[in-house]
Regions:
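Intrinsically disordered, low-complexity linker/assembly segments
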Residues: 1-92
Length: 92
């Protein structure tokens, strides 16, 4: 079979905490994709047998994650984020 490729947007909470996202396969079927906690931006997830069929074989579907960041928000929210990032040992 032939492999298929696609992209999905993920947010910070989804990649840090883990999540399930519904995606559409090339055949139009909707399937759940598990985003595990700690998934890195631009990670490529492989869905075996979800690509294009060719000569009796089924290809795989490869999905790349793209991190979408939220708007910075107000001063209070930025303060909470700064505290969280400091607690995580992040420098900024």
């Amino acid at each position: 079979g032939d492999d298929a490729y696609g992209d999905i947007p993920v947010n910070l909470a989804q990649v840090m905490l883990g999540s399930t996202i519904r995606v559409r396969t090339p055949q139009g079927k909707k399937v759940n994709v598990r985003i595990t906690a700690g998934t890195q931006p631009e990670a490529v997830l492989r869905l075996r047998g979800m690509g294009f069929a060719d000569r009796g074989r089924q290809g795989d579907l490869y999905i790349r994650t793209h991190l979408r960041l939220p708007e910075p928000g107000d001063e209070e929210l930025r303060g909470k984020l700064a505290e969280l990032f400091r607690d995580m040992g992040m420098k900024f």
